[in-house]
C-alpha cells in the first residue's frame, strides 16, 4: 500500500512545483486557506501521515509495523530547487506513506518524500487530494482518491466515522 495521506503537504508540494513558491510561501497559503493548522508540525513532519498509515496497516494486514522501526521524514527536507530539478526530468515529489508485508512476513512501513514518474498511480494527484494505491492479487493496482485537507473533508470523515461507530453499537451497517 502506498498513499498520499495528507492533503496539506500535497497542496504545498503542488504549489511549489506549479507556482514556483518557496516552502514558506506554500505553508503560509495553506494556513490562510485553512488546510494547515497554525502549528503545522504534524502535517509537514509526516506525523499525521504516519498515524493514518498505522490505521491502514491495521485494516489491510490486521497489525501494524513496529512504530520505532518506521522511518518518518517530512517535506521540510525538500527545497524548491529539488522540486524544480525533478520537474525538469518529468518527475514529481510526493509525500508517500507506504506499508507492506515483506518476504519474511514482517509488516514494514515508511513515510517520506518520494520521486514518482508518469507511470506511478500517485503522479497525477495534486492540490489537497489524498490517494491510496494498493496492489491486489486479482485486479492489479487499485487507486482511490479524494479531498484530504480543509474543514469539509475533515468534518465529513468525522460524521462518517461517528455514524459507523453508532451503527456497529446498534447492530446495523450505516452507509453515508
Identify the meaning behind each predicted range.
Residues 9-21, 51-65, 161:
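Oxidoreductase and adenylate-handling cofactor-binding alpha/beta cores
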Residues 2-6, 112, 135:
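Short beta-strand segments
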Residues 25-124, 129-131:
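Substrate-binding/catalytic subdomain of NAD(P)-dependent oxidoreductase enzymes
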Residues 1-16, 27:
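Rossmann-like dinucleotide-binding core of oxidoreductases
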Residues 8-11, 36-37, 139-141:
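A short, flexible beta-alpha/helix-coil linker loop
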Residues 119-176:
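ATP-dependent carboxylate/acyl-activation modules
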Residues 2, 16, 39-47, 72-76, ...:
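Hydrophobic alpha-helical scaffolding
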